[in-house]
């Protein structure tokens, strides 16, 4: 029960929160044509954590930041995800391109093209947008996120709306069209015609257009011209403490019920689990 009191003040509030979207059960796997990478479909846990709010004046300027402590809001839905190959992380690290910004940009590029394959409105499918306060911080974060592109149905409850199911079915075309859109756009850092989204709750602050092409090409098993990539850190993606770790396989509830398309049994072998320490960094050092 919440109690509301009417007051006259010169400010409004804006919620401060972040959302973790994590697959918890694989229901179907689809091999991406011409690639060793796979797309997965299944149950997604969406956990929203509200940690405070801003007070904004009439010109929407921040005049105060207030911290609150609330329990997380957790719900479940259906969605699709793609685990990013280690080779992409190696290249991004070598060129000092921000990994979280690259993931965020690639997710936006794919999201923008979903209406090409299923009738939907902007916002019907969502992703985990990256928060600049965390991604560009100069101190270690306890909230490490997997190197994964994740998309989930915003409507339909635990059963989903079916839109992400269609995206899963057409994932090969989605990836190719997203890459073509990124490469055809003449902007330098990203815009709404390629990797930015007008619906991004974090105002597209964490973006790497160059990094998104590395991720998309690696998923499609396409050749990547490393020397043609810019050397970071990029102007709008300053280097911070790494917040991304290798994605771990999400097991099915029952292998007998798992739908597999061009995937061998060993795809869920324990050997596929990995840690970030397996990746060699550009400087030959550690995390």
Which role fits each region the language model picked out?
Residues 1-287:
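Extended, highly charged accessory segments
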């Amino acid at each position: 029960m919440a109690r509301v009191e009417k007051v006259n003040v010169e400010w409004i509030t804006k919620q401060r929160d972040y959302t973790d979207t994590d697959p918890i059960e694989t229901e179907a796997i689809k091999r991406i044509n011409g690639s060793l990478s796979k797309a997965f479909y299944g149950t997604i846990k969406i956990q929203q954590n509200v940690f405070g709010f801003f007070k904004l004046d009439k010109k929407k300027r921040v005049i105060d930041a207030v911290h609150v402590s609330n329990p997380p809001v957790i719900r479940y839905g259906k969605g699709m995800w793609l685990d990013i190959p280690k080779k992409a992380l190696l290249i991004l690290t070598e060129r000092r391109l921000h990994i979280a910004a690259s993931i965020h940009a690639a997710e936006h590029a794919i999201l923008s093209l979903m209406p090409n394959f299923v009738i939907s409105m902007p916002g019907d499918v969502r992703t985990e947008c990256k928060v600049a306060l965390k991604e560009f911080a100069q101190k270690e974060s306890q909230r490490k996120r997997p190197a994964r592109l994740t998309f989930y149905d915003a409507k339909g409850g635990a059963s989903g709306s079916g839109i992400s199911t269609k995206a899963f079915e057409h994932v090969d075309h989605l990836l190719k069209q997203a890459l073509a859109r990124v490469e055809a756009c003449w902007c330098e850092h990203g815009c709404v015609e390629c990797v930015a989204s007008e619906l991004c709750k974090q105002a597209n602050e964490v973006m790497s257009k160059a990094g998104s092409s590395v991720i998309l090409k690696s998923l499609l098993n396409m050749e990547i011209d490393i020397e043609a990539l810019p050397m970071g850190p990029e102007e709008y993606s300053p280097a911070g403490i790494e917040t991304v770790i290798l994605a771990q396989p999400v097991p099915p509830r029952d292998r007998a019920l798992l739908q597999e398309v061009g995937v061998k049994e060993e795809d869920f072998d324990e050997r596929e689990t990995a840690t970030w320490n397996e990746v060699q960094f550009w400087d030959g050092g550690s995390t």
